[in-house]
């Protein structure tokens, strides 16, 4: 970026056994999805044996599985609305999720009625948390998930 005259915006993301799940909330166009995708890309690069452009003091680990739900994946051919697709994704996540899992979910709870979406999201989050999985979730608002939050 320096050679191209562009500014680099470093990000700090820290997950520990005590703080395994990060919820990034904020307005549209605030950088939530970019942060989520950056973490996912860097993790895939590491696990593929590629050099990872991070600070020399950074520490990363390997996961047995990386699960992602990023983007609107509705399908006319498969008769799936955004809501139906998301439920199928979460069903798959629940089957695969363990303490060796990194999950990345963009706009958690969207595609449904806000009240129902919030309740379902909270239920899925409880399972991910109980299985000691690591993850990052983006959303427009945190909803009732603050009980899982350290701060």
Residue map of PLM features:
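ATPase nucleotide-binding head domains, primarily ABC-like/P-loop NTPase cores
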Residues: 1-151
């Amino acid at each position: 970026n320096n050679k191209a005259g562009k500014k680099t915006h470093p990000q700090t993301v820290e997950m520990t056994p005590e703080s395994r799940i990060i919820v990034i909330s904020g307005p549209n166009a605030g950088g939530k999805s970019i942060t989520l995708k950056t973490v996912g890309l860097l993790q895939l690069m590491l696990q593929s044996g590629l050099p990872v452009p991070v600070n020399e003091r950074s520490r990363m680990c390997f996961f047995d599985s990386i699960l992602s739900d990023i983007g609107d994946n509705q399908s006319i051919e498969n008769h799936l609305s955004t809501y139906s697709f998301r439920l199928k994704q979460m069903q798959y996540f629940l089957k695969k999720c363990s303490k060796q899992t990194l999950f990345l979910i963009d706009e958690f709870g969207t595609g449904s009625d806000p009240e129902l979406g919030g309740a379902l999201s909270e239920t899925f989050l409880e399972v991910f948390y109980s299985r000691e999985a690591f993850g990052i979730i983006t959303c427009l608002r945190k909803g009732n998930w603050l009980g899982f939050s350290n701060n």
